Amino acid sequence: MTTDKDKMAVGRLKSRPQFLAVRAGESRRGPLFLLEVLDRNDPEGEARVGFTVTKKHGNAVERNRMRRRLKEAVRLSAGFAMKPGHDYVIVARRDLLNAPFDALTRALRDRIENKPKQKRPPAGSRKS
């Protein structure tokens, strides 16, 4: 069981410009969702999170269910892993509907805590 100390206050992204700003940050892809992360360079500010579910992933009932599952996963287990001064946008994928909830929370925690591996530079840019 988690205590109040384990849960960190997580703010919300609400306006379109806030969501668009996060797109300039790094992306962390996964089978259940895409996580976009932006460092606001504000270590005193709270972490903020926004949720996106596009219309191509189902009707309103299914989209709302995906959004509710993501919100609950952040509330229960992933909020503590979010770094202060960072913005997070979670873009749901269709497989999120049928995934077990514990797999969802585990994947979310892993994506938040682990930075993506560095991509190799293009072949022409290497020094010999």
Curated annotation (Swiss-Prot):
Q: Tell me the leader sequence span.
A: none
Q: Which UniProt keywords apply?
A: Endonuclease, Hydrolase, Nuclease, RNA-binding, tRNA processing
Q: What is its EC number?
A: 3.1.26.5
CC per GO annotation: ribonuclease P complex
Give GO terms for biological process: tRNA 5'-leader removal
Single GO molecular function: tRNA binding
Catalysed reaction, written as an equation: Endonucleolytic cleavage of RNA, removing 5'-extranucleotides from tRNA precursor
InterPro entries (UniProt xref): Ribosomal_Su5_D2-typ_SF, Ribsml_uS5_D2-typ_fold_subgr, RNase_P
* One of the Pfam families matching this protein, by short name: Ribonuclease_P
EC class, as a word, reads: hydrolase
What NCBIfam families does the entry give?
A: rnpA
Function per UniProt: RNaseP catalyzes the removal of the 5'-leader sequence from pre-tRNA to produce the mature 5'-terminus. It can also cleave other RNA substrates such as 4.5S RNA. The protein component plays an auxiliary but essential role in vivo by binding to the 5'-leader sequence and broadening the substrate specificity of the ribozyme.
Which PANTHER family does the UniProt record give? RIBONUCLEASE P PROTEIN COMPONENT
- Please give the family membership noted in the entry: Belongs to the RnpA family.
Q: How does it assemble?
A: Consists of a catalytic RNA component (M1 or rnpB) and a protein subunit.
The protein's name: Ribonuclease P protein component
Q: What is the primary gene name for this protein? A: rnpA
